[in-house]
């Protein structure tokens, strides 16, 4: 039996591509990623015929070459950003790639021989399904990725973002301490997003500034502590102002609730 083609749908920064990497690790397979954003030529998928100057295989076969195996986990990133023009429709070319009944004989124009893609586990990502053609969408099983809550962002930052940023900047864990209060303030007052990309940028900004301070101190025993009181020294003025409840009831004034991709808000 053929497996389903997975489509991860969610706002930027919610971990869609990372889940694809985790699937590859869990299955013990090679991982390859193809960015489809802005592709508007069918030849980018199927390849160019050899009669053209500068002809080369399509991105699918290039990815298979990079993986070096016949059964990788292939992530097709930003499948909702495909475009089309006089060069053809790349989304239509993907129909053969993602159809389990047809991809066992996928033919790249450059190679001009059938190639079996049936052993490849395809994972697609998109921010929305509105721009994905219906025939292509019907071939995939859509899985929605909701935005993270403040509590989830806190734990992601503690377990993953901060350790990774410290390692990238070459800072030992004991040299930089970001208090829980400061981390929560970053989430609530410096970022407003469904994912954690802006949160990651804020943490990296703090680590870069801390690295400069540590170099100036020239002491391996130096320790920098980032708290709520000195957080503005690293990130500047807060960007998000938490809504305050009305102190007094005024005639003709009501409090409204709103929902966006970044979460809830008070009007």
Task: Describe the residue ranges of each PLM region.
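Walker A/P-loop
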Residues: 2-36, 65-66, 95, 99
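Short loop/turn elements that form and flank the Walker-type P-loop nucleotide-binding site
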Residues: 2-4, 27-28, 46, 54, ...
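The Walker A (P-loop) glycine that initiates the GxxxxGKT/S ATP-binding motif of P-loop NTPases
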Residues: 10, 47, 78
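AAA+/P-loop NTPase substrate/partner-engagement loops
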Residues: 26-56, 63, 83, 152
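AAA+/SF3 P-loop NTPase mechanochemical coupling elements
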Residues: 67-71, 89-92, 107-126, 176-179, ...
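Conserved C-terminal "switch" segment of AAA+ ATPases
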Residues: 68, 128-138, 142-204, 209-223
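Conserved catalytic/switch belt of AAA+ P-loop NTPases
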Residues: 76-116, 138
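C-terminal engagement/docking regions of AAA+ P-loop ATPases
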Residues: 197, 201-267
């Amino acid at each position: 039996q053929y497996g389903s083609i997975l489509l991860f749908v969610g706002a930027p920064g919610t971990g869609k591509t990372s889940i694809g990497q985790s699937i590859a690790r869990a299955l013990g397979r090679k991982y390859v990623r193809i960015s489809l954003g802005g592709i508007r030529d069918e030849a980018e998928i199927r390849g160019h015929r050899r009669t053209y100057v500068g002809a080369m295989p399509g991105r699918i076969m290039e990815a298979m070459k990079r993986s070096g195996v016949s059964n990788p986990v292939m992530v097709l990133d930003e499948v909702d950003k495909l475009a089309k023009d006089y060069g053809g429709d790349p989304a239509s070319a993907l129909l053969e790639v993602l159809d389990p009944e047809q991809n066992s004989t996928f033919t790249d124009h450059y190679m001009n021989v059938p190639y079996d893609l049936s052993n490849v586990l395809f994972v697609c990502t998109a921010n929305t399904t509105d721009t994905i053609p219906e025939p292509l969408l019907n071939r995939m099983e859509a899985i929605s990725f909701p935005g993270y809550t403040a509590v989830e962002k806190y734990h992601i930052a503690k377990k993953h973002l901060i350790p990774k940023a410290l390692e990238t900047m070459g800072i030992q864990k004991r040299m930089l301490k970001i208090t829980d209060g400061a981390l929560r303030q970053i989430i609530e007052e410096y970022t407003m997003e469904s994912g954690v990309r802006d949160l990651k940028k804020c943490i990296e900004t703090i680590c870069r500034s801390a690295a400069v301070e540590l170099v100036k101190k020239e002491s391996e025993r130096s320790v920098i502590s980032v708290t709520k009181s000195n957080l503005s020294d690293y990130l500047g003025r807060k960007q998000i102002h938490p809504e305050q409840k009305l102190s007094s009831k005024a005639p003709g004034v009501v409090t409204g609730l709103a929902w966006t991709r970044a979460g809830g808000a008070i009007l």
